[in-house]
Curated annotation (Swiss-Prot):
This is Translation initiation factor IF-2. The keyword GTP-binding applies. Residues 81-104, 199-211 have a biased composition (Polar residues). Residues 525-527 are annotated as: G5.
Length: 874
């Protein structure tokens, strides 16, 4: 092979080497014609490099291997390809081994395809390579002089070159790395410089012969130092020979490994560091807190703190210092409390009532509205009279006599349990009468009746006098500032005594006219009709004095007397118009429901087209059932009514989700709770029954009402009772037909009542049944142990003498020693002269076997007793 680069020859001073190479080239040409084209074995190339080095440095002794050219040497396949290829790409000639010790082999030149297609020769710098071991001897040569040499390299890759098997795949990675994770190319801006393509298979740094492993050093004793071309166009450290060995220690599994973004053979420099979020530090003094704000009521602690630019914890801490315990979601509805909190932080708080003004369609009361009306538009309206008094004092019978009807016969138990509103005609004019219940459970109804009516007729039985509910009715009437007329009823009875009633009235500051006072008193009899005409005249006189007037042309306003759920009509309500006139088809707004009047009936179930002031009516067409006592007002249309009600409900639901605080006192006391579900025919009955149940106070058990609604007992009520283990109380209602079978299947307790005090008594009995009975120990007798006997089968048998009472089998026994109870248990066996007996009387001896106790001694006392359980009281 001819070396065309003259500069390399002159720089290295290889004149003699040039001659040797020329001779070797001629011998190679001859042998190439005889032998097939093969690649030069790497081992032979390494030997030639060693011989070349021996010529350069004669001071180092070399030992060449004498191999004859006649006998062809055994070809050794190289583990890695050489760094240089022969210049002739078509017919590469094999190099023969020189027999002389000073023979040299030319360096193998690797044909490299340059990325720049230029015709100029490329300068290659020869550098010392790693040494390859030979089995015979190991020769170390000093590095050649570091002068650049220029070699001419052909661009055409060699043909018919035997490929060398490698442990690396076409991707350039070891199979272990490919199995571990997939490779994902880096971003364009971070891609490393592309490697130059070579005509032969690329040599990998991990398995390169230039960097031999420890196993290679042990197997091979000779070293070779092939030259390789350094590309100066690449950045420093980009070549695989310049890289240091990476740390093969296992790395932690990260999120990038899951998507194949990490690879052990890749450079980590291209990866971008994750930008860590730095915490923003706020300066408390930099926040400008307002000095004047406007908030609506009610408002939560969280919202108030946001308006004041404060933390909720600061508000809670300040309120706790002043004795107010709140959490972040608690609601503040007191204007004074909100303003006090603002002053503590130097902020003036005003209450914003704009939203409430939109929802409040009535700005004043009915009386104020009438007073502001032009007197020319007012007319005289009938008086509204409420009959109030104690139960069974004859209120309903007296009203029946005035109306000439028989309502009392319809009431269950002959007591009024509903509020009735009637409009009756009398010789003195029309009167609207409200019949309120006299039972103690209907206190809310009596209070509503006192608020609505103009005159209160206090019915007192002449034979019984003033009772508890009578005093309560007086209290309600005085609170509403209503005129009171006393009707002393049952004057036809022989034990009637009006003076006793007068004395009792004077004691409560109702001095009768007969005694010189101002309170009107009339003796009446519902059965004989005595005093009824006088009562009507007195009511008409009081109405003239009060000057009761109303404006029939105004929009209708009034109050709900009673409401119920009808099977065919749905939600119905008994209303009383206080001002204006209610017509069919008008839209109404109640507190939390609305409706459009579809039908209107009077007390005789006759259709009505309008209801004037002081006239009661039964209306239908409501969205839901209003509560008794709710006011109503007529609005423009049903759409407006719906918007107002929805806005009110949304405001209520905003704070309805607030969790109830647990009753820690009840938890500490470990109270038992009776859960109830109440169903009734009307809303007033629910209020009465609920208030009566909640009035049952006990330190050991309490009643809790889970649900209360109007209507029949349905499947949903039964399922709720089964899930919560509650008892259903039905008052003046029934059970749906398809729900009766469900009651038996789920085992739910259902109690139906028509009289309210029967329902209250039943609830008391159920609450008492929840209490654990009190255990009482009653002594039956005692016996002294005189002797003990050991039995292998039964244990210890005690021979006793009954000293007091009777010892009975299958009773409880106490073992007493020195007035101290050692054990309590059952007496399992009792014998008298080897015979089982039920009892042994005083003065007799017996054998006793205790169940589970063998440690009694002679002289101990066995006390026989029985346990008696007594029910607790509320």
């Amino acid at each position: 092979m001819k070396i065309k680069n003259a500069q390399l020859t002159k720089a290295a001073g290889l004149d003699k080497l040039k001659q040797k190479l020329a001779q070797a080239g001629s011998s190679d040409t001859k042998s190439s014609s005889e032998k097939p084209t093969t690649k030069v074995p790497e081992k032979v190339a390494k030997e030639k490099v060693v011989k070349k080095k021996s010529v350069l440095d004669s001071s180092v002794p070399t030992m060449a291997e004498h191999v004859s050219t006649e006998t062809s040497p055994r070809r050794i396949r190289a583990k890695n390809r050489s760094s240089f290829a022969s210049e002739d790409s078509t017919i590469p000639s094999p190099v023969s081994v020189d027999t002389e010790s000073t023979a040299f082999s030319p360096p193998v030149v690797e044909e490299v395809v340059s990325p720049l297609e230029s015709a100029e020769p490329e300068i290659v710098e020869p550098t010392p390579a790693s040494i390859v071991d030979e089995p015979e001897t190991t020769i170390q040569e000093p590095p050649p002089p570091k002068k650049e040499a220029e070699l001419v390299v052909k661009k055409e890759p060699p043909k018919n070159v035997v490929s060398i098997k490698s442990n690396f795949g076409p991707t350039g990675k070891h199979i272990n790395h490919l199995l571990a994770k997939t490779f994902k190319a880096p971003k364009k801006e971070d891609k490393p410089a592309p490697k130059e393509r070579t005509g032969t298979v690329q040599t990998k740094p991990q398995q390169s012969s230039e960097v031999p492993s420890d196993k290679q050093h042990s197997s091979n004793n000779r070293q070779s130092q092939p030259f390789y071309r350094r590309d100066t166009s690449k950045r420093p450290g980009s070549d695989f020979r310049d890289r240091s060995k990476k740390d093969d220690s296992p790395k932690a599994f990260t999120g990038r490994d899951r998507y194949g973004l990490n690879d052990s053979s890749d450079d980590d420099k291209w990866r971008k560091k994750r930008v860590q979020k730095t915490k923003k530090h706020y300066d408390e003094h930099s926040v400008q807190r307002p000095t004047h704000i406007k908030v609506p009521l009610p408002i939560t602690i969280k919202d108030l703190a946001a308006e004041m630019k404060l933390k909720a914890s600061e508000l809670i801490q300040k309120m706790f210092i002043h004795g107010m315990t709140y959490v972040v979601n608690d609601v503040l509805d007191n204007e004074t409390t909100v303003q006090f909190i603002g002053l503590e932080f130097g902020c003036t708080i005003d209450i914003d009532s704009s939203e409430q003004d939109k929802l409040c369609i009535e700005s004043n009361t009915v009386k104020e509205e009438i007073q502001e009306t032009d007197p020319s538009q007012l007319i005289i309206r009938p008086p509204i009279v409420a009959f109030m008094g104690h139960v069974d004092h004859g209120k309903t019978t007296l009203i029946d006599s005035l109306r000439k009807s028989n309502v009392a016969a319809v009431e269950a138990g002959a007591i009024t349990q509903h509020m009735g509103a009637f409009c009756c005609s009398t010789p003195v004019g029309n009167i609207t009468i409200l019949d309120t219940p006299g039972h103690e459970a209907f206190s809310a109804m009596r209070a509503r009746g006192a608020e609505v009516c103009d005159i209160v007729v206090l019915v007192v039985a002449g034979d019984e006098g003033i009772k508890e509910q009578t005093l309560e009715a007086v209290k309600h009437a005085r609170a509403a500032n209503i005129t009171i007329v006393v009707a002393i009823n049952k004057c036809d009875k022989p034990n009637f005594n009006a003076d006793t009633v007068y004395r009792q009235l004077s004691e409560i500051n109702l001095l009768p006219e007969a005694w010189g006072g101002t309170t009107v008193t009339i003796n009446t009899s519902a059965k004989t009709g005595e005093g009824l005409s006088e009562l009507l005249e007195m009511l008409a006189l009081q109405a003239e004095v009060l000057e009761l007037k109303a404006n029939p042309e105004a929009r209708a306003r009034g109050i709900v007397i009673e409401s119920e759920l009808h099977k065919g009509l749905g939600a119905v309500a008994t209303i009383l118009v206080q001002n204006g006139t209610l017509h069919l088809g008008e839209a109404l707004v109640f507190n939390d429901c609305y409706g459009k009047v579809k039908t209107m009936h009077n007390e005789h179930n006759q259709l009505m087209t309008s209801a004037s002031p002081s006239v009661p009516a039964l209306i239908t067409g409501l969205s839901s059932m209003p509560k008794a006592g709710d006011p109503f007002v007529v609005v423009k249309n049903e759409k407006t009514a719906k918007e107002i009600v929805n806005a009110r409900i949304a405001g209520q639901q905003k704070f309805a989700l607030q969790k109830k605080r647990p009753n820690f006192d009840a938890m500490l006391q470990n109270k038992k709770i009776l859960k109830l579900i109440i169903k009734a025919d009307v809303q007033g009955s629910i209020e009465a029954l609920s208030s009566s149940v909640l009035k049952i106070v006990s330190d050991k058990v309490s009643a809790e009402i889970l649900s209360s609604s109007v209507g029949e007992i349905s499947e949903s009520d039964i399922r709720l009772a089964a899930a919560s283990k509650a008892v259903i109380i039905g008052f003046h209602t029934g059970i749906e037909s398809h729900a009766e079978s469900l009651i038996k299947n789920l085992g739910v307790k259902v109690h139906l009542f028509n009289i309210i005090y029967h329902a209250v008594d039943a609830v008391k009995e159920m609450m008492t049944a929840l209490l654990d009975p009190i255990a009482e120990e009653r002594n039956l007798g005692s016996a002294e142990i005189k002797e003990t006997f050991k039995s292998s089968q039964l244990g210890t048998i005690y021979g006793c003498l009954v000293s007091e009472g009777v010892m009975t089998r299958n009773q409880k026994v106490r073992v007493v020693r020195n007035n101290e109870v050692l054990w309590k248990g059952n007496l399992s066996s009792l014998k008298r002269i080897k015979e089982d007996v039920k009892e042994v009387k005083k003065g007799l001896e017996c054998g006793i076997l205790l169940e589970g106790y063998q440690n009694a001694q002679v002289g101990d006392i066995l006390q026989c007793y029985e346990v008696i359980y007594h029910p607790q009281k509320l």
